[in-house]
Amino acid sequence: MTRISWKENRVLSIETRKGVYVVGQMLKQPYIRFYNMFTTESSPNNVNTIKLTVLFTAAITRQFLRYSQVYVLKDATPDIREIDSDIWINQFSGSRKVIAYQGSGEEIGCMILGNKPGGLLVKKNLWWIPTTEQPIRLHPSGVFDEIICSDIPLTANDIIDKYELTGLCVFPYTNERLYLCSLYNKSVDPYKDLTFNRNLPDNYRLAVEIISGGFNDKKRNEILSTYFTDSQI
């Protein structure tokens, strides 16, 4: 694949699992807004993102763009409105081990961020730009602007489902997450569900295996071939 340079409001088609593509739009770097439009065409014509439903907006890594199959939709119409939420979920400091699918006989252990379940509800304007008067964000951490709730209840499903984690999207986890979004016709995030100690459906298993990183080279190559035959990661 040709390396894709960053251009604000550039509309993209990104492969999730092999042969299934999602529409995304570059915003202020490094954020991409993903839409609930999935297709088996790598380059659908005349896409108008103004008419599409947003799945989620998240920060992505260069690694995600480098190893994903990405196509620029040159005839697409971007939505240039700043419609993205400024409310996010920030995980607690530290890390911990969690066990997914306990009691199933096929448990998967994962190390995830956060020294305890849950997280903070925070305000973070993705469109913010440093200035001489305000070179860093307002919160002392410099990561977000302010804390709205210092400990989101694990039962606050409306909040948990509505807001994104502040972490970065990587390949191939995000690709698998987007594929799951296509199955559920909404935004889902196995990593966030692990963060909040939720029970996981069985079709999240591949995503959890990717999160765990606990496989040998042979298994790793098998997982990668699920996504891209010629992936060189």
Per-region residue spans from a language model:
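Alpha-helical structural elements
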Residues: 1, 51, 59-62, 66, ...
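Short N-terminal edge-element motif at the start of the domain
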Residues: 1-57
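Residue-identity detector for threonine
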Residues: 2, 16, 39-40, 49, ...
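Generic serine detector
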Residues: 5, 13, 42-43, 53, ...
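Intrinsic disorder/low-complexity segments enriched in polar/charged and small flexible residues
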Residues: 8, 90, 129-130
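Extended aliphatic helical segments
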Residues: 11, 20-23, 47, 54, ...
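Long, low-complexity intrinsically disordered regions
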Residues: 56-125
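A eukaryote-biased signal for long
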Residues: 102, 107-233
